[in-house]
Amino acid sequence: MSNDSSKAKQNQVDEAVEGEILTESEVETGNDEASLMDELTQANFRVEELEQALAEANAKIEEQKDSVTRAAASEANIRRRAAQDVEKAHKFALEKFANELLPVIDNMERALQGTNAEAEETKAIYEGVELTLKSFVSTVDKFGLKEVNPHGESFNPEHHQAIGMQPSPEFPANTVMMVMQKGYILNDRLLRPAMVMVSQGGSGVDTQA
């Protein structure tokens, strides 16, 4: 009987010990889970912080890109305007210089018209002026100065200025029959219109402009 009682007590002791072991195991497991959840929570917070920092960094990068782009565009505009200003200044200076040269050309042409090329006493003068004029015209031609000498051409109000109209059986109506003064174009821009007499055709009355 005593043996049965002892066994029963031993079983109770064993069950109690086993229960304590299970309880401790459950406590440890619960602690581990709580610790893991805490670590996961901290990790999530850290990830959110890093994502926010990355977003801010990307925003700053985009802002810097915009600043660089605007600065580059501004510099390009400044360069373009400077180039345009230089070009305008160059054209203005060239145009002013060309305008100063036109009377010189006109005077040499008038000198040729008023000099007898066949007379011995004036032949050398004529040839000298003619050679100088050709050289002069050739030089200014290199800078884009072209003469407008429309004799026999149709009247063009964009390049010609009519000083009058006359009947002419030789020239069709609205044709330049005489060039009173040559015009000039500088780099495709009209510098001075040609002063011309325009034909009315085979009949009509003289009309002065």
From Swiss-Prot:
InterPro entries, sorted: GrpE, GrpE_coiled_coil, GrpE_head
GO molecular function per UniProt: adenyl-nucleotide exchange factor activity; protein homodimerization activity; protein-folding chaperone binding; unfolded protein binding
A Gene Ontology term for the protein's cellular component: cytosol
Keyword Flavoprotein annotated: no
Composition skew (Acidic residues), residue ranges: 15-31
NCBIfam families: PRK14139.1, PRK14140.1, PRK14150.1
Subunit and partners: Homodimer.
Record's protein name: Protein GrpE
Organism: Shewanella woodyi (strain ATCC 51908 / MS32)
This protein's encoding gene: grpE
